[in-house]
Curated annotation (Swiss-Prot):
GO terms for molecular function: ATP binding; GTP binding; molecular adaptor activity. Belongs to the RapZ-like family. This is Nucleotide-binding protein Rv1421. Displays ATPase and GTPase activities. ATP binds at residues 24-31. GTP binds at residues 75-78. GO terms for cellular component: plasma membrane. PANTHER family: RNASE ADAPTER PROTEIN RAPZ.
Amino acid sequence: MMNHARGVENRSEGGGIDVVLVTGLSGAGRGTAAKVLEDLGWYVADNLPPQLITRMVDFGLAAGSRITQLAVVMDVRSRGFTGDLDSVRNELATRAITPRVVFMEASDDTLVRRYEQNRRSHPLQGEQTLAEGIAAERRMLAPVRATADLIIDTSTLSVGGLRDSIERAFGGDGGATTSVTVESFGFKYGLPMDADMVMDVRFLPNPHWVDELRPLTGQHPAVRDYVLHRPGAAEFLESYHRLLSLVVDGYRREGKRYMTIAIGCTGGKHRSVAIAEALMGLLRSDQQLSVRALHRDLGRE
């Protein structure tokens, strides 16, 4: 297996925009690679016609544009593909930009299996067999592969492994952080639809029944202290934080960069808010996490 996943030097001489062209065999993971680049902050254009690539670059070079990193996914829709790629390279060279080419590939057996699982036909298959379509594409793209800056063989890579390869090459500091949202809510208003994990903290005494705490929220120090000093609260936070650390590590390995943890109480005003804030503080001890708290039902009463 060839997997030249290493840091690839930015060769844009103009300094205005960095361009990556993602190409390779159909079914080898171009789309997944594009999603990873998007997560890393790249502006991604999927299946952009070759004649429009230079226009997109010109837009990125224009004053006021926020596009500094452009990734374009190019697939083999015509037999003039190699010539199209050469034309794009030549046009960009006139703008002092040398695009980096990422070539995605996989073994024939792997590609056949993926196509059969997805029940799709190969773009070059036509009246031929699937294997013949794959072979034709390999021959067509051989010149592109020979000059690619980065070749990634996805035959034995999981989605997480492919993500790691792309991040090592283009992520700068070795990869993006995982964004975690700790969301408090009230069960009487329904479950958050986007939650990855839901925890019920109604086992803790409700400050609603304490007259001086009732009008306050879980963000107030008096309510926070009341909730966090109830029996079992500290033990719960310690245990749940330890559990979440294991889950977050698994999410990272699988390439998932966004996670929502929902913490619920009756109305989403006292207990869930205090626990969510405390949990956010614990999770922020992990420097690879970007953590925020969201209080969905606060002020709803």
